A protein has these predicted regions:
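Non-catalytic propeptide/linker segments at domain boundaries
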Residues: 1-22
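Active-site mouth of glycoside hydrolases
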Residues: 17-231
C-alpha cells in the first residue's frame, strides 16, 4: 500500500507587539541597533563598493552585491553579524544619481546614472519627467520595489529582524530645491494631475517648502492618491 505523505503545516508567523514601550516578538524582548538605508549617493567603482552599506531597493542592472543590487541573504547576514535589529527603509531621494550635483535643471536626456534608488511608484510610459525618463503613474505601484521589501520582511522575520518602512520622505518636500525636482509627486513628473504649482516655487531661487501643500488632504486628487498609497 502506498504511503500517504502529509505536507507539514506552516508554522504561525511570529507575533510582534509593543508592550510598555518595548518591542517584543512572541513575548520575547527584541534588542539591537538600527540601520538606515542609503537614499542617495553611491558609485560603481570597486574602491567605493568596499565602503558601501546595504540598501534593499537600490538597483544596478546586471550586478549584485554590496553597493549594487544587494542579495537579500547577505543583507540579513550583515545585520545579524552587526547585531542590527531594524532596517529603516526610505525610498530614494531621487532615482538618477546625476542629481547628486544638487542642480535643479531639467536633464536634456534620459541617460541616467546608477546606482538607481527605486521609487515606490511605477512609470507610465508617457511623457517625459524632469530627469528624462517617462512620467510616473502614482496609481501604479513599482512591483520590484514592493517585492524587495516583502522578500526582506519575510526572510528577516525568520531571524527576528524588523523592517520599518517610512511611507513619506520629508527631504523631498523641504530644504534644497533639488530634492523636489525629480520627485514623483511633482506635477511635471507624473500623469496624475497632482496640482502642485509649476514652475516649482523655489524660495530664494533655491529652497523648496511644499510640505503644507503635500499634506493638504482637502485637495481631492492628492487625498485619493495618499489614501491609495498608505492603505
Amino acid at each position: 500500500k502506498e504511503k500517504k505523505i502529509t505536507p507539514n503545516k506552516t508554522s504561525a508567523k511570529p507575533e510582534v507587539t509593543i508592550a510598555n514601550g518595548r518591542i517584543q516578538m512572541n513575548s520575547t524582548l527584541l534588542v539591537g541597533s538600527s540601520h538606515t538605508t542609503p537614499w542617495w549617493n553611491g558609485k560603481l567603482k570597486t574602491n567605493f563598493l568596499k565602503k558601501a552599506s546595504p540598501a534593499i531597493t537600490r538597483f544596478v542592472p546586471g550586478r549584485e552585491g554590496l553597493g549594487l543590487t544587494d542579495r537579500m541573504d547577505s543583507v540579513i547576514g550583515y545585520m545579524i553579524q552587526k547585531n542590527i535589529l531594524v532596517f529603516d527603509q526610505n525610498y530614494g531621494l531621487w532615482y538618477d544619481r546625476r542629481r547628486d550635483d544638487h542642480e535643479r535643471v531639467r536633464r536634456r536626456d534620459g541617460d541616467v546614472w546608477g546606482p538607481f534608488y527605486e521609487q515606490p511608484f511605477g512609470r507610465s510610459g508617457q511623457g517625459t519627467a524632469w530627469e528624462g525618463l517617462s512620467k510616473y503613474d502614482l496609481n501604479r505601484p513599482n512591483a520590484w520595489y514592493w517585492s524587495r521589501l516583502k522578500e526582506f520582511a519575510e526572510k528577516g522575520n525568520k531571524d527576528g529582524l524588523l523592517l520599518f518602512h517610512e511611507n513619506y520622505f520629508q527631504h523631498n518636500i523641504l530644504e534644497a530645491g533639488a530634492h523636489w525636482v525629480d520627485c514623483p509627486w511633482r506635477s511635471t513628473n507624473n500623469i496624475n494631475q497632482t496640482g502642485f504649482p509649476e514652475p516649482a516655487p523655489f524660495a530664494g531661487d533655491k529652497r523648496i517648502f511644499v510640505a503644507d501643500m503635500f499634506y493638504d488632504i482637502t485637495h481631492p486628487v492628492r487625498r485619493e492618491l495618499h489614501r491609495q498609497y498608505i492603505r
